[in-house]
Amino acid sequence: VTMVSLPTDPIHRDRVLTDKETVNLYESCENSYLFSMRSIVELAIETLCRRGELLNLNYKDCDLTSGEALVRETKSGKPRKIGLSTRAIEIIKNLPRTVDGKLFNVKSVSSFEKQFSSVVRKAGILDFHFHDLRHTGATLLAMKGWTTIELMQQGGWSSAEMVARYANIGAKHLAKRLKSL
């Protein structure tokens, strides 16, 4: 019995872009073959949407007046409403219209992933995946004071535990908050 190893908790990714990496990534996106790459990356951070949710988002589901969007194709299969920041609204307003009504004209997930990997590599960023943009966005919103409930709704997470995996508040931020008391 002593030879049997107990299962361990899986190691979860907690990769968040630094400010410098964000600038480098945005600059690299500007040179992408995919015209809307920067808009996709920025909206992923701003909205906390998963890749599939974002690439399937339609103009008709974005109410730029109220600042809300309906994400129909979610991981859970249940549509959810999200808030749109001022920056997200600005990005959506400036997107060229597509024939199929989607925000982005992306041919396939595999071609998109190749383009995204290319801009990350050209930006000099190591060990970074598209899904890590959710970590970056959740962390930024948490540092701005968003509650767990707000983050759960925006990101489509079903538990506070999941939010804690994505919102990676560092010791530097905690020290800054304590100094302001």
Across the structure, where does each feature detected by a protein language model lie?
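Basic, Lys/Arg- and aromatic-enriched nucleic-acid-binding interface segment
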Residues: V1-R51, L55-N56, T65, K75-S76, ...
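Well-ordered beta-strand positions in beta-sheet-rich domains
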Residues: M3, E68, P79-G83
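N-terminal core-binding DNA-recognition domain of tyrosine site-specific recombinases/integrases
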Residues: I11, S32-F35, N105-S111, D127-D132
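Catalytic-site neighborhood detector that most strongly recognizes the C-terminal catalytic loop/helix
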Residues: V16, E73-G77, R87-I89, V109, ...
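Mobile genetic element proteins and their domesticated derivatives, centered on retroelements
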Residues: T18, L25, F116, V163-Y166
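C-terminal catalytic core of tyrosine-transesterase DNA break-rejoin enzymes
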Residues: S39-E42, E46-E53, S118-A123, R134-S158, ...
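C-terminal secondary-structure termini that scaffold catalytic or DNA-interacting sites
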Residues: S66, N94, S180-L181
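Active-site/catalytic core of tyrosine-dependent DNA strand-transfer enzymes
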Residues: S85-L126
